[in-house]
């Protein structure tokens, strides 16, 4: 087994090691998608192209399941996913829009509390 740690694993909790495991799995799934994508891009055989694209889609599914696990289990993922995934318009402007929406919600909450 390769050493996936940059810090001593013995100093990490079980949960922290599970998060490292998930992140490494996610990296492997994304790498597999990349490899299949490249193979699909260069093959001339239609049937082989379809098979490899099917394989790539399976790897994408695995990556998404791992992302969902990370969202549920490591702080930070949920907020970032809510900001950037499925947003409309310019992706770079999504953060600013999210901040504005948060400020509006904070104002509403303050009004409710003051009543």
Which ranges hold each PLM region?
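Iron-associated oxidoreductase/ferritin-like identity signal
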Residues: 1-115
């Amino acid at each position: 087994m390769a050493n996936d740690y940059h810090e001593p694993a013995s100093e990490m909790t079980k949960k922290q090691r599970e998060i490292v495991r998930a992140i490494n799995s996610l990296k492997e799934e994304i790498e597999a998608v990349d490899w299949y994508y490249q193979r699909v891009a260069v093959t001339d055989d239609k049937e082989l192209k379809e098979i490899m694209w099917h394989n790539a889609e399976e790897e994408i599914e695995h990556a998404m399941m791992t992302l969902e696990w990370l969202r549920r289990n490591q702080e930070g993922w949920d907020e970032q996913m809510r900001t950037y995934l499925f947003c409309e318009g310019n992706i770079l402007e999504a953060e600013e829009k999210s901040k504005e929406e948060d400020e509006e919600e904070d104002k509403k909450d303050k009004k409710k509390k003051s009543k």
